[in-house]
UniProtKB/Swiss-Prot annotation:
GO terms for cellular component: mitochondrial chromosome; mitochondrial nucleoid. It comes from the Eukaryota. This is Mitochondrial genome maintenance protein MGM101. Performs an essential function in the repair of oxidatively damaged mtDNA that is required for the maintenance of the mitochondrial genome. Binds to DNA. It comes from Mycosarcoma maydis. Keywords: DNA damage, DNA repair, DNA-binding, Mitochondrion, Mitochondrion nucleoid, Transit peptide.
């Protein structure tokens, strides 16, 4: 009996000793597993994400990269990403004119002195006492050899200058070309009855009077883009002298038409400037307009594809209106 009780007691003690370490093991392992998962999640959050840098997208030569990385701030003419840092690249304004001419006026325009030639066809010579052989003197003249030529018409800031305005008239040959009667065969009429001279005709008259390169147009203001209209002020320069200024206008119907409208505004300004030279001045004479319409033009009824009728003007020697208009009779 005693032996049986001893065996039962030993088995009970053995089971108790085995269950205690097991409970301790399980209780100790549970928090260890949870802390390991928390540490793993923190490491996952703190791990940096790989991104593509600007240096990989825009590789630069090693010499340029070392130069840019060595300095604290980007140097000209490139930033650290390889983009240009020059203000002239990002500006639409033309570069400023040089303070002094780089080419001698005698080489660029032989025989011309401030826009006109002397009677014998040679440039007027100036006294060479104290004048250097090259460079600009303090009196505003450019010396080359034994001749001193004014440079006021070479480096003028035509955005604000009025140099040569009303100084003297042009030569008789130029005046005869500018003031010649208008050739009625060159005059066109719009469907609304407005008569005009094509812009290329004005350029041909100026080329005939002053020669190619003897005149030009310079912008007087920035391009003004409004609601469906572009305008800009231009100045007409002939033989290095200010002649006239006018603001040209041109309509446009969509944003992609702004560049073309800018060119149209320049042509419109040229036409208005030519009024001061007397070119085709008859186009602003009401009596000439009435006589020209009666002699060379005809007003007709025209019908569009929708059946709407409208009065339109055309020259008598022009063919009838085409699609989408169809002439139905004389008005």
């Amino acid at each position: 009996m005693r032996t049986m009780l001893t065996c039962v007691a030993r088995s009970a003690l053995r089971q108790t000793s085995m269950s205690a370490p097991a409970r301790a093991c399980f209780s100790a392992s549970a928090p260890a597993l949870s802390s390991r998962s928390r540490n793993y999640s923190k490491q996952q959050q703190q791990q940096p994400v790989a991104r593509t840098g600007l240096k990989d997208l825009h590789p630069l030569p090693e010499s340029m990269r070392e130069q840019l990385e060595s300095s604290d701030t980007p140097q000209e003419p490139y930033t650290a990403s390889g983009n240009s840092n020059d203000p002239a690249v990002h500006s639409s304004r033309p570069a400023s004119q040089p303070a002094e001419p780089e080419v001698s006026p005698r080489v660029a325009a032989p025989g011309l002195v401030n826009g006109s030639s002397s009677k014998n066809g040679s440039p007027s010579s100036a006294s060479s006492n104290g004048a250097s052989s090259s460079g600009a003197s303090s009196s505003g003249t450019y010396s080359s050899g034994n001749a001193s030529i004014p440079i006021s018409n070479i480096s003028e800031a035509w955005g604000t200058s009025f140099a040569g305005l009303g100084e003297r008239s042009f030569s008789k040959e130029a005046i005869d070309v500018l003031m010649a009667p208008i050739n009625e065969a060159d005059v066109e009429i719009k469907p609304d009855g407005l008569i005009y001279l094509p812009e290329i005709k004005y350029r041909r008259i100026l080329n005939k009077a002053f020669g190619p390169g003897g005149w030009g147009m310079a912008p007087r203001s920035e391009t003004n883009v409004g609601q469906g209209i572009v305008s800009r002020e231009w100045v007409l320069i002939c033989q290095g002298r200010f002649v006239a200024t006018a603001r040209g206008e041109q309509e446009f119907f969509k944003p992609s038409g702004v560049p073309t409208a800018s060119e149209g505004a320049k042509s419109n300004a040229l036409m208005r400037c030519c009024k001061d030279l007397g070119v085709s001045s008859e186009l602003w004479d009401p009596r000439f307009i009435r006589q020209f319409r009666k002699k060379h033009c005809i007003e007709v009824w025209a019908q569009d594809t929708a059946g709407k009728k409208k009065k339109l003007w055309r020259r008598k020697d022009d063919p009838p209106f085409e699609y989408p208009w169809k002439e139905t009779g004389t008005a």
